[in-house]
Amino acid sequence: MIKAENLTKRFYDTVAVDHIYAEIHNGSVFGLIGTNGAGKSTFLRMAAGILKPDEGSVTVDDETVFENTKVKARCFYIPDEPYFLSNGTAEDMKVFYQGIYPKFDAARFDKLLKNFELESRRKVQTFSKGMKKQLAVLLGICAGTDYLFCDETFDGLDPVMRQTVKSLFANDIEERNLTPVIASHNLRELEDICDHVGLLHKGGMLLSKDLDDMKLNIHKIQCVLPAGVGSSDLQGIDIIKTEQRGSLLTLTVRGKREEIQTILQAYHPVFFEMIPLSLEEIFISETEVAGYDIKKLIF
């Protein structure tokens, strides 16, 4: 497990990461959401042992990461702009990482290169941005590490390739308990892969929640209530947001689905249905309650 406690990093007068507490459990997919400058990259670099915290700590299975060779060998970091050897080829990068990561799976890497139609002997500097991202992901997956830190990894990939990469992650999560930590400015990119999402803003963690819990506890309801009954009359329901269009009432509510249904049915609605919420809608609801406008934070 990765644990950050009071984690802080400053660059001169700028606080890049501001006293963050977070836990990332093994085998889960943790998403970090935030705009550029929110602190995502700095957090990942400290978690991977590249940067030293100014305050607090980040540990992997209770061991400090920075300057700990044994722990760092279990971590692979894919930066927003991946590093490749000057004039190097994909084959050169394979040999390079074989010397760093003992569990690097060269046979799997060669197979994936062919599947992704990436030339092993072609200089990486001639690759497109998307091809470089693909190569970085393949190197990270084949390194055989327990933790994979991905900084805007899906940026530059077309929709088909994004799904292919997500499938690779899912395979390694199931087979060897890989723990990806994925930073992105795009919430939609993470909706179908993450188990847990943290929202970073100005170096602070505004929100950190399990997605299943969020989806189970926030619901959208559309209903038509009997004449004379309005949303203010609904007792026992934690209403986050109300929208009225003619007789159709749309509610965003918090609580257990069955209990909400029971309470609403007691008012004998003319029409009633519960609609699944997207991750974006859930985050908007959660952050509005906390007094933030998420559209200004990540969109």
Where is each model-derived feature located?
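ABC transporter nucleotide-binding domains
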Residues: I2-A4, K9-D195, L199-H201
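Short phosphate-engaging motifs
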Residues: A16, E67, E189, G230, ...
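Short, flexible helix/strand-to-coil boundary loops that buttress conserved ligand/catalytic motifs
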Residues: T69, K215-I218, L264, T287
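Short loop/turn segments at beta->alpha junctions
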Residues: T89, D210, I275-S278
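ABC transporter nucleotide-binding domain
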Residues: V165-G255
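C-terminal coupling/interaction segments
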Residues: T252-F299
